[in-house]
């Protein structure tokens, strides 16, 4: 043997009979091969190689064997010798400390080793030890035997053939023998491992298996060294490249055209590959022919295995290649590798993240080696016959740029020359063959699911791998980045994932235990489809949907899937093909993305429209179907399943559904796939979700950063940068989505960009190669990938919307973003997010126990020193929702809460949820107002004192507020005001202290409002800065402003509450007592109270004092309303400033834009001028210069147009943005104002006006939670109580009214006695339900007696009354009434009264007589005398004490001057603290209550009979809509002179009817009906005034058995007459008849009782919400006089805008014993009425009549207007119909005229042709007049002849011509007039000639007419002259033209055309004479104007005409 053969290394290849392909790698002859010893004889002797003179020893590649199968030549794709998983971080190298250098030297005993080292150094730059064949045999001999049992092949099929050294070749394998020297394919590559290194590469999830191969088995055995103990020893590693490779950066499988990696001698590479040959996600592979190979150093044994699965042996029917690098075999059957000399290798191996496990696998000589599988497509061969390769190393690919060698085609095996440049590589023209499927499948891959190995690892894992040389890599296909918007479901799931991880995101700890990476992976999976993260959403989204709707909903649930649907639809429609690449992402709770896509494509496009190559056995079939079937347009493929074996005939689009964090990895995987035809049309479309981590990853890729370095170490800062991108934007959009009322899973938070994306996508696909740049892209971005980085001139979609500050740290960013949010998830997840540790609950969190008083709450770890109410939930979320939303075990940061302030109005119906419309747009304020719920007023139970938590919160807030006041430098007064205001808020509202920012905002806002109240100047901006800096507050200005606006609305209420503390109905601070205990006891016992003299002066003073307090009270409510309006005005001003600022910014941007484009245009103009000057100078030729200048102008015009178009687009876009911003501001303003109005509306209704110390009245169980307080004023002689309702003070003159306020205490257990006083008000007040006003001007000489109702004081309150020691003055007469409370809103209103009674005080008719004032109480007539007050109250509680209804009470009292009577609702409001009591001033002689009546219902009837000088009966009844009417005790005014018996009445009415029935002198009786009150919103407070009456009347006690719902009060005024009174009342119950006691008479003596039957009380106002009156009801009274019914004053106050609605109910005792008074009047049988004149009655009657007349007038005018409208409409319709007919007739006339003109033109053509034939005489030579000239003349004449009307045919028919018919019948046309002044001449077509010639005989000739084809040609005949047709006799014919007279005889005969009567053959045209033609050409016609004068003349025209 030769010397070089002895030194060389020998590689051996083993083939089976079924082998179909050779080693797909070119062999590089770097070292000679080693010959192995004889079979079975181990030897350490170096085997010399074959002859060194082999032609292919160094230059030619090693032989690549091929074999035939099924008649086709199949190439064996070379698996990478160094394969690693896509997730591997490090290459685990098996480093054995065992072994010695002696073992290595044992294999290197050849004396010529030193010469070989030089060759080794040439390629590896280091000395590689040479191993003998014995080393290889020792390694594989026993190992390959064990795999023999796994091979399912017969001995014939497995017969081995030795190739390379020509030892054994099977006889039947001719292909192998004949092609041993064939080079490997051009694109095949291999990797080289150094000597003594064993590389085991395996995927993550699947076991490494050894499979049987029945067809194709290739075994490459590199030399190894066998030691005596059967161990394999490798040489130490000395190349630092080893560490780089072992770091897990380069173990990648090169693509089909990628560079190969050389494995140096001495290393065994064991690698497993899934059929798709997945490649590491982060590996930058190189293209062929451009890259340098990279080699592993000598002495490294690399065993790479993944973490998840054990190393197994499996069977596989594909191909398997085993690469055996030289190792050293020892005697103990172990593989020994020398330790690496570089210790950094071990450090790198150990310091990896643990994603790849270091595995030490002993390679036993007999079994272990054969059990290791390197490629899933190949199997280990059996047998001991190992054929050594001719080379000691695995050949490098031909793609290496230093190799210019012939290659072999992959398909046809033709040898071809390949240069180093892959772009210039020749492509074989052979047709790609289908991929053959394996015939014998022994064991398929797992069919239970797709691949989940490390190559199939979820997309979230970041791969750390380095490419060999990424700087030389560039993409083959153009790539476009396609933006996709998240759907609503994805948006919520994305934000929910971030929200659930808020604790770890905002943490400062650097040890997160993988929480950040887990969050990153979760949000990336969400971007693909929400089902990937949570499969339970499928049930939620598809609930209650039809079957055909489910697919659409699931598609729209993912923005990517929705866009993919559109893209694939377009692709299928246009007959294109696409490959969809996806990442195999899956979670335990979700679905696999591949299955989702497969179901989608199958259902949407049909089962035959796609292929999905998941499994090994089905992948080849799927690819073949995709290539063959025309209907199959989609191929689904996992990104890492791409391999060089996949060959597609055509693919127009590669769609990347999911992306890696390093986008270049996806491109490298995709480019492994080979496109055989039209590959230049293939484009890559990468879908990315905007404003998410996917977009941020692309931004990083575009920033020219090395991606392998950017994502190599996914550190904390990079993870935060990815997660922070777009988070704020998405949370803002989440607020929009949650604010919408109709959730939709589609893209709804912004206008979808899908249409624009699809348009650009279709444009790119339709463009040809090289035209991509011509497509103008706005949404899609073309990314240029070169040298491992991306570059682009455009920005991504989200970069225009997101401005992320780099200065803000991540923890601050997440704290601000997530700290104040508490979203209500619309798509809650059933699987909460996993948490690394259990979070400690903060006190007050949702998980804390809900205790009533908060005292039993377990102590927990606190986040701060704040105290939280344990019952706080905002908004209330049940456990299921909390678990579903992932907030079950979150702390304060995980589940933030919102501070809430809720009013006490529980009846408002709010449920604590945020109204979506109100929350919309608030994020634009710059903070999180949207996080603060709209319902900022929590309901407070007014029946209970504040609970323990609120009191404890108050205790905690006091020192906090004190500290804040100190920091803000507030004065002592302001600090005191802060404490008072805080106390008020705590008592009336519920405050929560979560989240902390809102709680801090509340504190600052409280200090602001306190400073405002004490008028201390406090800068809001400065105070906020101080609080944030000194107290570490983190609240924003917007939050403080919002809460401050709410507190501002409470300012006036707080002031009223503060002032009300000094007014106490039982308070000792009142210097003057009002009620005597003795009098109270007497009142309760039924004793008679003596008449007391009333001092007029004291009454006037008390009236003034009462008026003053009323004004104050109304002022408070008016102030509250003004505060609300002021707050709203401030909001409007604030937004107005923002709008102005926005407009200003818009104008600035617009001007900047215009200036920019103006500059551009100026630059272009300058450039154009310069270029034009250059052209003028350089171009000497004029033509060239002009052409160049024109071209220059054209080019610049196009540029100018482009600039203009671009400017217009930018301006339009700017305007749109401006409009959107303005719209958003308007929506924000409306939202804020609406929320303030809603808050204020509920607050005004339910605001408590409390008296200071009346809390002892809150003991009833029936008390309403919304019952307001009653404020009581005590002055010198008066106790005033005001009903707590809303009224507005108007500035018109006030009408005095009688205010009868009826009320009871809450639950009836306690009642309060109030005194009726005189009140005078000069202002017109809107008085609500239970308020009445009366103005009294009493004179000392007048007498007035007032009957007052009973005073009901419960027994348990008598001690309190006794303790007061109050005394009743003789000058006082007081009525005690009880006010009712209700939880209903006060909706009844009293209309404003415009009449003035300011002169009432001057009237002498209403003077009070103190001596005659006597009130006596009659208890004899009552049926239940024995009941005391307690029994009455108890019975009331049992039967009718309901606070849910309202009782109106009205009383129209007689007043002196004419005025309107204002009736008010008889319902007052009261809460547990007190009641409103309306004083009634009166001149009482005495009073005595009688509680003996039996109360069975809530109705009460009172009769008032004042006596006046006049006599007029007025009956007024009150109504109200009541649900469960409460009882009202109404004080009535009278001037009694005697005692009257108290009648008994059984009243069943449903409303309170207060009827004043004065007797009228005349027979007229006036009935006042029910009428409503004004709207609630116009009333801010109630003015409680009493109207004194100077009338003398009586009031009887009513022992009523009341079954109705309301109180009926009847006031009877005795008059001189005795007219029947018909009262309008309320509807009654089924019992229509009522027993009534006789009404008292106003007479000096006692009168017998009279029975009053009240029947048929009907009130329509109960059911109608807006009504001004009620129907009249009859009140039958037994009296001798006639009965007169008067209609009610139904419309009395309707004109003033009366509106009726639910009012406040009043609960009063039903039994009142009113003292009867004796009045000196004449008795009347049965019911005598005294004579009484009352000016009020006259005024009321007048107003009633005016109202009726007004209504009648209105109806009449309305009917007149309606009739007028109908009449005018009929006239207008008739007029337009007439105009329509005129236009139509005009149109028809014009159409007829046009038709006539058209027919005339046709006729003139015929005549012209006839003249042409006639004028051509035979005398004229044919050559004398050219035919063309004649035709020109004819055309000119045609223009002139069109102006003439032809009438000659009718005239010529009457002549005696031989041919009488001038024209044929079919040619006779209608005539129409032309606008021309003269008739139109004849219109010849060919030419015009004279009408006559010199020879009349010529007229006898017949000529054919040529120019116009006609059914028959016109003939010209000579007509004998007759007198009728001569010019003298017939004016229709004219003489010939003057210039033709020389050619005419003396008697010229006119010509006429006639239709031929006989068939005359047409003849050719001839010309008469040359002179005629010349004359026509030279002379103009002189007689044209004269020839146009006649309609029937034949005109002869000259040539010019």
Swiss-Prot record:
Its EC number is 3.6.4.-. Residues 19-126, 169-207, 243-311, 441-468, 841-893, 1466-1517, 1528-1547, 1624-1644, 1915-2001 are annotated as: Disordered. Keywords: 2Fe-2S, ATP-binding, Coiled coil, Helicase, Hydrolase, Iron, Iron-sulfur, Metal-binding, Nucleotide-binding, Nucleus, RNA-mediated gene silencing, Transcription, Transcription regulation. Residues 953-1044 are annotated as: Conserved MOM1 Motif 1 (CMM1). Residues 1993-2001 are annotated as: Conserved MOM1 Motif 3 (CMM3). Its main location: nucleus. One of its GO terms (molecular function) is ATP binding. Residues 563-722 form the Helicase C-terminal domain. [2Fe-2S] cluster binds at residues 400, 409, 412, 430. It is an enzyme of class 3 (hydrolase). Disruption phenotype: Reactivated transcription of heavily methylated silent loci, independently of chromatin demethylation. Releases TSI, 5S ribosomal RNA genes as well as 180-bp and 106B repeats of chromocenters silencing independently of chromatin properties. Partial derepression of 35S promoter homology-dependent TGS in transgenic plants. Abnormal aberrant mRNA transcriptional read-through. Increased expression of minor 5S rRNA species. No nuclear organization alteration. Lost ability to form a high molecular mass complex with PIAL1 and PIAL2. Released transcriptional silencing of target genes (e.g. InterPro entries: MOM1, MOM1_dom, P-loop_NTPase, SNF2/RAD54-like_C. Residues 693-722, 1130-1168, 1194-1217, 1736-1785 form a coiled coil. The keyword Ribonucleoprotein does not apply. Residues 103-126, 189-204, 269-280, 292-309, 863-872, 880-891 have a biased composition (Basic and acidic residues). Changing residue 1806 to P: In CMM2-mut3; slightly reduced multimerization and transcriptional gene silencing (TGS) activity. One of its GO terms (cellular component) is nucleus. Homodimer. Interacts with PHD1, PIAL1 and PIAL2 to form a high molecular mass complex which mediates transcriptional silencing at heterochromatin regions. Binds to AIPP3/BDT1. Requires for the complete maintenance of the 35S promoter homology-dependent TGS induced by T-DNA construct insertion. Together with PIAL1 and PIAL2, regulates transcriptional gene silencing (TGS) independently of changes in DNA methylation. Required for the heritable maintenance of transcriptional gene silencing (TGS) in heterochromatin, and particularly in the intermediate bivalent heterochromatin, characterized by an unsual methylation pattern consisting in hypermethylated DNA and histone H3 'Lys-4' methylation (H3K4me) together with depletion of histone H3 'Lys-9' methylation (H3K9me), in a chromatin methylation-independent manner, in a non-CG methylation context. This is Helicase protein MOM1.
């Amino acid at each position: 043997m030769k010397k070089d053969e002895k030194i060389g290394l020998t590689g051996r290849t083993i083939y089976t009979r079924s082998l179909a392909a050779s080693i797909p790698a070119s062999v590089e002859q770097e070292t000679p091969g080693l010959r192995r010893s004889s079979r079975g004889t181990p030897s350490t002797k170096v085997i010399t190689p074959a002859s060194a003179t082999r032609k292919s020893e160094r230059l030619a590649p090693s032989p690549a064997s091929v074999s035939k199968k099924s008649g086709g030549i199949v190439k064996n794709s070379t698996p990478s010798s160094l394969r690693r998983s896509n997730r591997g971080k490090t290459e685990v190298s098996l480093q054995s400390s065992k072994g010695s250098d002696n073992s290595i030297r044992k294999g290197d005993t050849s004396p010529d080793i030193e010469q070989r080292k030089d060759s080794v150094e040439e390629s590896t730059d280091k000395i590689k030890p040479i191993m003998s064949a014995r080393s290889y045999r020792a390694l594989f001999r026993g190992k390959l035997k064990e795999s023999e049992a796994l091979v399912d092949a017969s001995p014939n099929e497995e017969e081995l053939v030795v190739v390379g050294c020509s030892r054994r070749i099977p006889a039947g394998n001719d292909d192998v023998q004949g092609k041993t020297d064939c080079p490997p394919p051009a694109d095949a590559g291999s990797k080289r491992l150094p000597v003594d290194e064993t590389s085991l590469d395996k995927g993550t999830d699947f076991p490494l298996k050894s499979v049987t191969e029945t067809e194709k088995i290739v075994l490459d055995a590199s030399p190894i060294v066998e030691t005596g103990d059967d161990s394999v020893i490798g040489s130490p590693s000395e190349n630092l490249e080893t560490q780089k490779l072992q770091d897990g950066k380069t173990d990648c499988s090169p693509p089909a055209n990628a560079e190969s990696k050389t494995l140096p001698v001495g290393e065994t590479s064991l690698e497993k590959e899934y059929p798709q040959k997945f490649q590491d996600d982060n590996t930058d592979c190189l293209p062929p022919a451009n890259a340098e190979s990279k080699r592993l150093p000598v002495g490294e044994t690399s065993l790479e295995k993944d973490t998840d699965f054990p190393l197994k042996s499996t069977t596989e029917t594909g191909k398997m290649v085993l690469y055996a690098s030289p190792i050293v075999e020892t005697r103990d059957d172990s593989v020994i590798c020398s330790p690496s000399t570089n210790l950094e290798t071990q450090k790198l191996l150990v310091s990896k993240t643990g994603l790849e496990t270091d595995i030490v696998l002993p390679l036993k000589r007999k079994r272990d080696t054969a059990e290791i599988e390197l490629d899933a497509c190949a199997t280990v061969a059996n047998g001991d016959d190992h054929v050594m390769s001719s080379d000691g190393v695995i050949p490098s690919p031909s793609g290496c740029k230093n190799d210019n060698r012939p290659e072999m085609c992959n398909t046809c095996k033709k040898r071809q020359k390949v240069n180093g440049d892959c772009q210039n590589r020749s492509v074989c023209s052979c047709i790609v063959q289908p991929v053959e499927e394996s015939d014998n499948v022994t064991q398929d891959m797992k069919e239970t699911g797709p691949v989940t190995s490390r190559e199939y690892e979820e997309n979230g894992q970041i791969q750390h791998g380095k490419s060999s040389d990424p700087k030389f890599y560039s993409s083959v296909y153009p790539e476009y980045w396609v933006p996709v918007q998240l759907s609503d479901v994805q948006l919520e799931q994305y934000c929910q994932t971030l929200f659930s991880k808020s604790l770890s995101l905002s943490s400062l700890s650097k040890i997160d235990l993988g929480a950040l990476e887990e969050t990153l992976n979760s949000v990336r999976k969400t971007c693909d489809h929400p089902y990937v993260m949570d499969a339970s959403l499928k049930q939620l989204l598809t609930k209650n949907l039809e079957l055909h709707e489910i697919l659409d909903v699931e598609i729209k649930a993912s923005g990517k899937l929705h866009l993919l649907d559109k893209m694939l639809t377009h692709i299928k429609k246009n007959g294109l093909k696409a490959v969809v690449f996806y990442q195999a992402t899956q979670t335990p709770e979700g679905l696999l993305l591949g299955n989702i896509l497969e179901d989608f494509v199958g259902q949407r496009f049909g089962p035959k429209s796609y292929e999905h190559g998941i499994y090994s056995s089905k992948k080849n079939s799927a690819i073949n179907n995709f290539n063959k079937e025309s209907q199959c347009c989609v191929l689904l493929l996992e990104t890492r399943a791409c391999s060089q074996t996949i060959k597609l005939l055509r693919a127009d689009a590669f769609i990347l559904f999911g992306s890696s964090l390093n986008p270049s990895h996806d491109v490298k995987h995709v480019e492994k796939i080979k496109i055989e035809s039209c590959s230049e049309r293939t484009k890559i479309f990468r879908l990315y979700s905007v404003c998410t981590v996917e977009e941020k990853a692309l931004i990083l890729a575009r920033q020219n950063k090395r991606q392998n370095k950017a994502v190599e170490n996914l550190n904390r800062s990079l993870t935060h940068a990815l997660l922070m991108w777009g988070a704020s934007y998405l949370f803002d959009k989440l607020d929009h989505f949650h604010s919408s009322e109709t959730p939709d899973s589609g893209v709804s938070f912004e206008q979808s960009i899908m249409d624009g994306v699809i348009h650009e996508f279709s444009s790119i696909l339709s463009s040809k190669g090289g035209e991509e740049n011509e497509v103008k892209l706005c949404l899609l971005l073309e990314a240029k990938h070169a040298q491992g980085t991306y570059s682009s001139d455009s920005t991504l979609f989200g970069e225009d919307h997101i401005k992320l500050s780099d200065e803000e740290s991540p923890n601050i960013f997440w704290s601000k973003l997530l700290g104040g949010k508490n979203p209500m998830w619309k798509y809650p997840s059933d699987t909460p997010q996993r948490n690394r540790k259990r979070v400690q609950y903060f006190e007050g969190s949702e998980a804390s126990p809900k205790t009533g008083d908060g005292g039993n709450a377990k102590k927990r770890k606190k986040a701060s020193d704040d105290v939280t109410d344990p019952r706080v939930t905002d908004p209330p979320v049940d456990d299921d929702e909390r678990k579903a939303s992932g907030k079950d075990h979150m702390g304060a940061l995980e589940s933030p809460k919102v501070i809430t302030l809720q009013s006490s109005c529980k009846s408002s119906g709010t449920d604590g949820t945020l109204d979506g419309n109100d929350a919309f747009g608030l994020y634009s304020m710059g903070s999180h107002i949207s996080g603060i719920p709209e319902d900022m007023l929590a309901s407070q139970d007014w029946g209970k004192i504040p609970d323990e938590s609120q009191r404890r919160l108050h205790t905690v807030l006091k020192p906090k507020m004190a500290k804040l006041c100190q920091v803000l430098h507030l004065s002592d007064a302001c600090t005191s005001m802060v404490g008072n205001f805080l106390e008020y808020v705590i008592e009336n509202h519920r405050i929560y202290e979560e989240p902390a920012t809102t709680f801090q905002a509340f504190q600052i806002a409280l200090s602001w409002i306190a400073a405002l109240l004490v008028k201390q100047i406090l800068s809001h901006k400065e105070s906020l800065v101080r609080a944030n800096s000194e107290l570490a507050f983190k609240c924003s200005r917007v939050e403080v402003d919002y809460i401050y606006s709410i507190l501002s609305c409470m300012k006036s209420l707080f002031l009223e509450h503060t002032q009300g503390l000094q007014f106490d109905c039982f308070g000792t601070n009142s210097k003057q007592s009002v009620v005597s205990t003795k009098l109270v006891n007497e009142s309760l016992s039924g004793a008679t109270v003596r008449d007391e003299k009333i001092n007029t002066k004291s009454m006037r003073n008390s009236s003034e004092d009462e008026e003053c307090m009323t004004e104050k009270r109304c002022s408070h409510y008016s102030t509250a309303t003004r505060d609300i309006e002021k707050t709203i005005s401030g909001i409007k001003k604030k937004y107005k400033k923002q709008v102005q600022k926005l407009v200003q910014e818009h104008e600035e941007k617009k001007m900047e834009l215009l200036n920019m484009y103006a500059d551009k245009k100026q630059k272009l103009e300058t450039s154009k001028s310069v270029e034009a000057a250059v052209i003028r100078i350089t171009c000497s030729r004029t033509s060239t210069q002009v052409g160049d200048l024109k071209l220059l102008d054209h080019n610049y015009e196009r540029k100018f147009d482009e600039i203009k178009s671009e400017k217009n687009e930018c301006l339009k876009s700017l305007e749109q943005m401006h409009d959107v911003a303005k719209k958003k501001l308007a929506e924000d303003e409306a939202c804020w104002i609406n929320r303030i109005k809603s808050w204020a509306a509920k607050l005004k209704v339910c605001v408590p006006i409390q008296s200071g110390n009346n809390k002892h009245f809150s003991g009833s169980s029936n008390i309403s939670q919304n019952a307001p307080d009653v404020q009581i004023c005590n002055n010198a002689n008066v106790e005033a109580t005001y009903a707590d309702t809303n009224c507005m003070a108007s500035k018109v003159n006030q009408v005095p009214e009688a205010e009868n306020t009826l009320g009871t205490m809450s639950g009836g257990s306690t009642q309060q006695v109030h005194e009726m006083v005189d009140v005078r008000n000069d202002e017109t007040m809107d008085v609500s339900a239970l308020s009445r006003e009366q103005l009294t001007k009493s004179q000392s000489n007048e007498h007035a007696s007032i009957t007052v109702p009973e005073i009901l004081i419960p027994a348990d309150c008598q001690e309190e009354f006794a303790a007061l020691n109050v005394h009743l003055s003789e000058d006082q007469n007081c009525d005690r009434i009880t006010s009712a409370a209700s939880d209903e809103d006060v909706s009844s209103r009293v209309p404003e009264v415009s009449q003035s009674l300011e002169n009432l005080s001057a009237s002498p008719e209403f003077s009070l007589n103190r001596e005659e004032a006597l009130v006596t109480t009659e208890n004899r007539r009552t049926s239940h005398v024995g009941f005391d007050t307690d029994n009455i109250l108890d019975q009331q509680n049992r039967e009718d004490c309901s606070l849910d209804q309202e009782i109106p009470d009205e009383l129209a009292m007689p007043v002196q001057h004419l005025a309107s009577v204002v009736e008010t609702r008889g319902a007052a409001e009261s809460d547990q603290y007190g009641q409103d009591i309306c004083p009634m001033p009166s001149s009482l002689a005495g009073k005595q209550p009688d509680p003996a009546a039996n109360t069975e219902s809530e109705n009460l009837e009172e009769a008032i009979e004042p006596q006046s000088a006049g006599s007029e009966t007025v009956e007024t009844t009150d109504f109200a809509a009541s649900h469960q009417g409460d009882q009202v005790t109404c004080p009535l005014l009278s001037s009694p002179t005697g005692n009257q018996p108290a009648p008994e009445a059984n009243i069943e009415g449903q409303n309170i009817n207060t009827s004043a029935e004065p007797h009228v002198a005349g027979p007229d009786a006036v009935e006042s009906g029910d009428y409503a009150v004004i709207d609630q919103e116009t009333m801010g407070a109630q003015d409680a005034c009493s109207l004194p009456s100077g009338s003398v009347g009586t009031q009887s006690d009513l022992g009523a058995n009341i079954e109705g719902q309301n109180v009926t009060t009847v006031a009877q005024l005795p008059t001189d007459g005795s007219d029947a009174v018909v009262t309008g009342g309320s509807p009654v119950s089924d019992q229509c008849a009522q027993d009534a006691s006789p009404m008292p008479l106003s007479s000096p003596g006692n009168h017998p009782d009279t029975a009053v039957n009240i029947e048929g009380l009907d009130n329509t106002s109960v059911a109608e919400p807006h009504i001004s009156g009620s129907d009249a009801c009859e009140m039958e009274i037994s009296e001798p006089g006639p009965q007169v019914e008067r209609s009610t004053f139904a419309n009395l106050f309707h004109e003033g805008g009366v509106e009726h609605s639910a009012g406040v109910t009043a609960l009063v005792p039903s039994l009142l014993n009113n003292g009867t008074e004796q009045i000196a009047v004449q008795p009347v049988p049965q019911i005598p009425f005294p004579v009484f004149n009352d000016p009020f009655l006259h005024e009321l009657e007048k107003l009633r009549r005016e109202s009726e007349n007004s209504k009648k007038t209105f109806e009449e005018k309305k009917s007149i207007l309606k009739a007028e409208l109908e009449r005018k409409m009929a006239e207008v319709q008739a007029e337009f119909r007439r105009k329509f007919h005129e236009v139509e007739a005009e149109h028809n006339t014009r159409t007829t005229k046009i038709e006539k003109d058209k027919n005339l033109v046709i006729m003139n053509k015929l005549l012209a042709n006839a003249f042409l034939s006639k004028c051509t005489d035979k005398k004229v030579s044919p050559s004398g007049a050219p035919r063309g000239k004649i035709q020109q003349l004819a055309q000119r004449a045609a223009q002139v002849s069109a102006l003439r009307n032809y009438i000659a045919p009718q005239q010529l028919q009457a002549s005696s011509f031989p041919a009488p018919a001038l024209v044929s019948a079919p040619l006779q046309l209608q005539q129409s007039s032309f606008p021309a002044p003269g008739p139109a001449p004849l219109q010849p077509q060919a030419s015009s000639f004279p009408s006559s010639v010199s020879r009349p005989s010529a007229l006898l000739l017949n000529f054919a007419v040529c120019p116009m084809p006609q059914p028959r040609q016109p003939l010209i005949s000579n007509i004998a002259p007759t007198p009728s047709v001569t010019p003298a006799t017939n004016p229709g014919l004219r003489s010939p033209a003057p210039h033709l007279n020389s050619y005419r005889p003396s008697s010229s005969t006119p010509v006429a055309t006639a239709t031929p009567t006989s068939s005359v053959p047409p003849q050719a045209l001839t010309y008469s004479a040359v002179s005629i033609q010349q004359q026509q050409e030279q002379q103009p016609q002189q007689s044209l104007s004269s020839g146009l004068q006649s309609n029937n003349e034949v005109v002869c025209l000259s040539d010019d005409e």
